[in-house]
């Protein structure tokens, strides 16, 4: 190693191979700090990646910046000046990328750490024949066939996928009209550069979209009749519906139909249903988890019957961040506990924010101390925009 005149080691002169060896053992935050040491360390980081991060972070919105809370360190980090993009609101994330939209319902994909920005096509770039009216204030109207006009609509369920190396992306979103989920779903990819509409199911019926999840180029859609649709995006921009899958003809029916429901995927690709139950006798256990049960035979007949059963653990060593559609591995990962659900909830009536981790086996709830002044939710006609969001950032090589 080179030294200065007084014999002090000159760390900026470390060879790239040694720096790369060090970088791959650093945590996400230490890697980010190392990049700022000097120009040689920064350029060495362009061809390196840190240890894969599985620790959930929290995004909090301010006027001109975002605050990001590292749950492992329990520290806040402030983004660079984001200007008007700080008023955008996140609806989905993939790694360090966050899908956001502004008051005029323009969509962007932003990396708050770099910050890189991908502008998505305006809604007018659509082959659906649907016209969008965007008066502002985070709402919009849709005009179908120049006759039917929706009432006030807001962005609903959304998913985002981004390839860290090529920056290819897929964005899928639905909307709610008067707080009721719509059956219409729109998607856009880097190759398409316009908005397309997800076709109706092969049966031709339209069911409202309650939730969506995406993994391994497949989009899972939970509909209002409890059925699950799976669309394969691996063959190009036009998705192909998969009719023969384990969840075909096995709708999910719950005894609490009015409670919030989430559909999530495990790391192995299995579907789990997560239901928020925060009233009555279930205050101690705010979530119920369901999984497709094993095949059994009834006493009355030899027909195989498959249903959904309550489970008290995720597969293997996994945990769930509510704002993500796929569970996370926890083995050998600091800052995240096995069989836990990380969630953030803000009450419309009181604006009291709960940022917590719920341990499924013990029913223990750990609350994070998030100062109230660090988040400024926006109220608009009963809509609370700007809730904090959990996400799991990562650095790819070359960032």
Swiss-Prot record:
Source species of the chain: Arabidopsis thaliana
F-box domain location: 9-56
SMART domains: FBOX (SM00256)
Matches recorded under Gene3D superfamilies: 1.20.1280.50
One Pfam family recorded for the sequence: F-box
Cleavable signal peptide: none
Name the record gives this protein: F-box protein At1g10110
């Amino acid at each position: 190693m080179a030294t200065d005149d007084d014999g002090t080691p000159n760390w900026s002169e470390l060879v790239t191979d040694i720096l790369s060896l060090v970088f791959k053992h650093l945590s996400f935050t230490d890697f980010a700090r190392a990049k700022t040491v000097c120009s040689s360390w920064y350029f060495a980081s362009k061809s390196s990646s840190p240890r894969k991060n599985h620790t959930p972070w929290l995004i909090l919105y301010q006027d001109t910046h975002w605050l990001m809370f590292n749950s492992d360190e329990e520290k806040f980090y402030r983004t660079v000046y984001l200007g008007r993009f700080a008023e955008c609101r996140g609806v989905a994330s993939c790694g360090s990328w966050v899908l956001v939209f502004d008051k005029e319902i323009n969509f962007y994909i932003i990396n708050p750490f770099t910050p890189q920005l991908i502008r998505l096509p305006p809604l007018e770039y659509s082959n659906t024949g649907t016209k969008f009216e965007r008066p502002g204030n985070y709402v919009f109207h849709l005009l179908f066939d120049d006759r039917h006009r929706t009432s006030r609509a807001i962005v609903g369920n959304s998913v985002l996928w981004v390839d860290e190396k090529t920056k290819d992306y897929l964005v899928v979103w639905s909307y709610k009209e008067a707080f009721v989920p719509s059956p219409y779903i729109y998607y856009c990819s880097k190759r398409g550069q316009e908005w397309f509409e997800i076709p109706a199911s092969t049966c031709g019926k339209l069911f409202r979209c309650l939730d969506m999840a995406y993994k391994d180029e497949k989009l899972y859609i939970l509909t209002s009749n409890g059925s699950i649709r799976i669309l394969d995006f691996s063959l190009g921009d036009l998705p192909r519906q998969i009719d023969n899958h384990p969840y075909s003809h096995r709708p999910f029916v719950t005894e609490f139909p009015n409670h919030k429901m989430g559909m999530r995927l495990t790391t192995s690709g299995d579907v789990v249903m997560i239901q928020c139950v925060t009233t009555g006798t279930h205050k101690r256990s705010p979530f119920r988890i369901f999984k497709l049960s094993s095949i059994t035979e009834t006493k009355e007949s030899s027909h195989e019957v498959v249903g959904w059963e309550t489970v008290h653990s995720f597969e293997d060593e996994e945990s769930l961040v509510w704002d993500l559609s796929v569970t996370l591995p926890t083995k050998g990962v600091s800052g995240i506990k096995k069989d836990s659900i990380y969630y953030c909830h803000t009450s419309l009536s009181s604006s009291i924010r709960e940022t917590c981790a719920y341990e499924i086996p013990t029913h223990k709830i750990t609350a994070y101390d998030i100062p109230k002044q660090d988040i400024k939710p926006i109220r608009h006609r009963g809509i609370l925009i700007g809730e904090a969001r959990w996400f799991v950032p990562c650095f790819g090589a070359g960032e």
